[in-house]
Amino acid sequence: QIENEYGYFATDSSYLNAMKNIMTEYGITVPFITSEGPYRDSMNAGCIEGALPTGNFGSKTEERFEILKDYTNGGPLMCAEFWVGWFDHWGNGGHMKSNLEENVQDFDRMLELGNVNIYMFQGGTNFGFMNGSNYYDELTPDVTSYDYDAVLTEDGQITEKYRRFREVIAKYKEIPDVKLSMDIKRKSYGRLEIKDKVSLSSTLDKISKPVFSVYTQSMEKLGQNYGYILYHSTLDTEENIERIKLWKANDRANI
């Protein structure tokens, strides 16, 4: 897969082709795909020669596949991300649940008309600061759980969605009769009280090394793909500062 939903963000075929060429140079020989939102603007921006266009969506299968047909040049139709649930964001009021009957109908239609990759087949866990976030009108960070209302739960429990999807698959492919024997015990560990604490500022020299720069450096510039960056700056001026503008300061800023 070359990039992911890049057509939502930019129109830059030279970049996408460069990514494809790098993969080829390093020995990738399997067929290439692009993975886009099935809308004409994003497909026009994200599709390139030599890669099968696929779509990411969770409903309206016929409508989405009809758009894909205009870009696949007779090739196979593929839903690369069939969204069977959604993220849990902090403050969204509880665990997100999809409509099972609609999921089953769309899954059936996808197998009838084309191909599908289930997202997610099994839920996962966002460890540490790897939770990520959506950012449309405002920042909406994900919680630790990435259960996603998936076909199998975060801890591997078999769901009704699993059973219903299995029935759909059996319409198109013979499935062996396998006894489902998972018996996963769950346990509540109660309430854990935190008694000790330490300030971040008192431990900085032990957990990190400073980087000095005239300009603010991004995570990419610093070779960092995880966690946070703590920025410090001293404004040398004898005049009173009445207004400071901070762009996209999503966490904390002390002045």
Residue ranges and their predicted role:
Residues 37-39, 57-61, 236:
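Short beta->alpha connector loops
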Residues 146, 157, 168-242:
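Extended carbohydrate-recognition surfaces in non-catalytic/accessory domains of CAZymes
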Residues 40-42, 64-68, 105-107, 218-222, ...:
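Generic recognition of flexible, low-complexity loop/linker segments
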Residues 33-34, 114-120, 175-181:
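Acidic/polar loop patches that form or flank catalytic/metal-binding clefts of enzymes
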Residues 241-255:
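Aromatic-lined ligand-binding clefts that engage carbohydrates, nucleic acids, or primary amines
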Residues 1-50:
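Active-site neighborhood of glycoside hydrolase catalytic domains
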Residues 22-26, 56-153, 157, 168-171:
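Catalytic-core region of carbohydrate-active enzymes that cleave or remodel glycosidic bonds
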